[in-house]
Amino acid sequence: MNSGTLIFVRKGDFCIIKSEDVYYMNVLFPNFYRNSHFDVSKDFLLDIREFIERREFDKLSLIAEDIRKNYENYKDKEVEEVEIVKKELI
């Protein structure tokens, strides 16, 4: 299991976890399973460094929305759950 530092949270949408030199996006999927009221979060390894360095969090929100709408297109970037070991919000 990978682990990292929580660096950004947009409640009800996504969070960003940094592990060494890579960034993971943890995306919240409301009602992921059909006929279920449970929310599920999934982690994705994405090339989002530039967005983070430029503080373009609205663009990251659009990426999270696209992941939810087109989950099948992102399955190859999905990783095992990333454990958050500390919190250093930017």
Report each predicted region and the residues it spans:
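Extended, alpha-helix-rich binding/interface surfaces that flank or overlap catalytic cores
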Residues: M1-I90
